[in-house]
Amino acid sequence: MKLALRALFLLVIALGSTSLPAQHDNHDGHDHGADDGHGHGDQAGVVHEGCAHDDTYDPAEVILHHIADANEFHFVGDIHLPLPLFLYAPGHGLTTGLSSMLGDHHHLKAVDGYVMNHGRVNRMDDGAGAAMLAGEHDVECILHKTVADDKGKEVDVYYAKINGKEYKLNGASVGDGGLLGGGITNFYDFSITKNVFTMLLAALLLILLWTGVARGYKRNEGQAPSGVQALMEPFFVFIRDEISIPMIGEKYYAKFHPFIMTVFFFILFCNLFGLVPMLPGSANVTGNIAVTMALAVIAAIVAYVHGNAHFWGHVFWMPGVPVFVKPLLTVVEVLGLVIKPFSLMVRLFANITAGHIIILSLISLIFIFGGNGESVLGAGAGGVVGVAFTLFMNFIELLVAFVQPFIFAILTASYIGAAVEEHDHEHGHEGSHDVAHEDLNDGSPAYA
């Protein structure tokens, strides 16, 4: 149990540190950070007429906003739950507080240049001047423009309108080298976002749950399990007998079983929280590529660090084949080492994200058929169709919430089993590892 708790703690820390800089998604998912360094934006503020608000329903914008991370929980209307902010700007220092200090939808504030833009913290460009990047200022509204960057690519740029002037907003710095639309801007966001809060909550519940189960085993030693212990024991036995032992082997499974259990239940709890429309749910944790990447990288590190000479010998100098073929097979095997965690990452991310998008798309039928409130009959028809299909998809999502942790756990166990397998024991469980090797070496979604 202590090993499991340590593994869970390290897992949460790794996930949090990986996902914090990657939570740069804005409300519509376009490139908001990569263009921030371009010279298109008006640096010192430009007088702008009006602050018109477009009430036209945009399903794509709404869907991408709901599956993205945010610096606050939004319930309904103007009801929000603020989250802690830890913002750092080079040359200015650290700014802390709750997200509520930046105001609400009807009364936004700029604090030290930071502005809340559709649930995500942005900062005014350095060209706004020292006076605007310090103290508090009332924000009239957030303006959105689609412009062409230096390469001719259309990007979304946001401006904060203050005292009749507009100031360009930058997204938080993201260490993706611009590959995913991020880049280094004028501030870093280390805040507790919705995803981070949900991960911490899932970790806390897991610690409390399994600590209680451990106490039950000590207190009722030799007796039939009861209460929470009776509820969780089938999960423990199933994962041990159907995943850990078959994939890793009798000799080594006990060492890695706590890690497999931690991964399984962490993903499961995050998935279940994502199905809850309000607190403590609504966060799309496993639908965030940074989180699934961290999980996959951790799984790969655990497997490869414990790889024995037999495993690495097959990777770099495959036995039993002609010498001139060995270099080619080495390239293939090394690629396989990268493809395996990559397939883990994409499989979990794609399945969870697709489910959320489908459900939100079905709900959007109500507003699409209703023509933004112009057609009551259309809204009613959309409601009947949308609700019926949404209920069906929720059942599918609930199934996926359990299936995906199982897939992730069994593939992780197969990677570990292949790494620690000893040559003398190949005949004892070669079937499971051979199947895993054939299905997984090319990264194909054999279990999806």
Give each language-model segment a name.
Residues 7-16:
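Bacterial N-terminal signal peptides
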Residues 208-247, 307-314, 423-427:
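Juxtamembrane interface elements at the cytosolic ends of transmembrane helices
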Residues 242, 256-278, 284-424:
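Hydrophobic alpha-helical transmembrane segments and adjacent short intramembrane/lumenal linkers
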Residues 182-187, 239-253:
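Cytosolic juxtamembrane amphipathic/interface segments immediately preceding
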Residues 1-7:
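Positively charged n-region of N-terminal signal peptides that target proteins for export
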Residues 422-448:
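Terminal, Lys/Arg-rich, intrinsically disordered segments and adjacent short helical elements
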Residues 4, 224-227, 248-257:
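Membrane-interfacial loop-to-helix junctions in multi-pass inner-membrane proteins
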